[in-house]
Amino acid sequence: WFLEYSTSECHFYNGTQRVRLLERYFYNLEENLRFDSDVGEFRAVTELGRPDAENWNSQPEFLEQRRAAVDTYCRHNYEILDKFLVPRRVEPTVTVYPTKTQPLEHHNLLVCSVSDFYPGNIEVRWFRNGKEEKTGIVSTGLVRNGDWTFQTLVMLETVPQSGEVYTCQVEHPSLTDPVTVEWKAQSTSAQNKMLSGVGGFVLGLLFLGAGLFIYFRNQKGQSGLQPTGLLS
């Protein structure tokens, strides 16, 4: 037995401003022939596809028909789907965190997690103290969630110094303005001081609440007592 099939892919850039049609032909799961509208003719991927490529390229009418499919197939279907898929916009959720909880001035990987967004075209940039980082950036690329939304991780390799501010900036068609999320590099002592301050504040609130509770309870008890020593 054998398996022979083909696929048609429409690639859109900036709406329908630029459209690329890619038709791929397979034999037993191996691609042997393709038509690329950017090339304008059939090209053999393996020797098995060479006879078909030569045959179809020698037929001007058939070749012109495949070139026109950019409009008759791709742009035509885009206009149909435009009513549902293209206008759909889902804003991304952005979070920033380090992969390791370790002292500063050690190699670390900062992660900018961008999730649950649609469409898939998105731009994620890293900044350190307001200056864009161009090197040390690793990305997972787009990952499909299976519900018409996407996610991606864009990581920055760095050695954080105390006081530095790292910013992940995300631009997406669903956003009127870029979203920025900051991560501030703090020493262990600074983190401990901050946690102590927060803990003291919470403890103070607890004591205040307990004091108010006792005060109002006593006030209620006193208001319920009957006056004594009055002559009738």
UniProtKB/Swiss-Prot annotation:
GO annotation, cellular component aspect: MHC class II protein complex
Cytoplasmic domain ranges by topology: 217-232
Domain Ig-like C1-type: 92-182
Keyword Glycoprotein: yes
Parts of the chain that traverse the membrane: 194-216
Membrane topology: Single-pass type I membrane protein
Sequence segments annotated as region (Beta-1): 1-90
CDD domains: IgC1_MHC_II_beta_I-E
Keywords per UniProt: Adaptive immunity, Disulfide bond, Glycoprotein, Immunity, Membrane, MHC II, Transmembrane, Transmembrane helix, Ubl conjugation
Annotated InterPro entries: Ig-like_dom, Ig-like_dom_sf, Ig-like_fold, Ig/MHC_CS, Ig_C1-set, MHC/Immunoglobulin, MHC_I/II-like_Ag-recog, MHC_II_a/b_N
Segments of this protein annotated with the region Beta-2: 91-193
Main location, first listed in the record: membrane
Pfam families per the UniProt record, alphabetical: C1-set, MHC_II_beta
Record carries keyword Disulfide bond: yes
Extracellular side: 1-193
Post-translational modification: Ubiquitinated in immature dendritic cells leading to down-regulation of MHC class II.
Compartments, as annotated in UniProt: Membrane
Cystine pairings recorded for this chain: 10-74, 112-168
Family: Belongs to the MHC class II family.
Stored PANTHER family: HLA CLASS II HISTOCOMPATIBILITY ANTIGEN, DRB1 BETA CHAIN, MHC CLASS II-RELATED
Protein name according to UniProt: H-2 class II histocompatibility antigen, E-S beta chain
Gene source species: Mus musculus (Mouse)
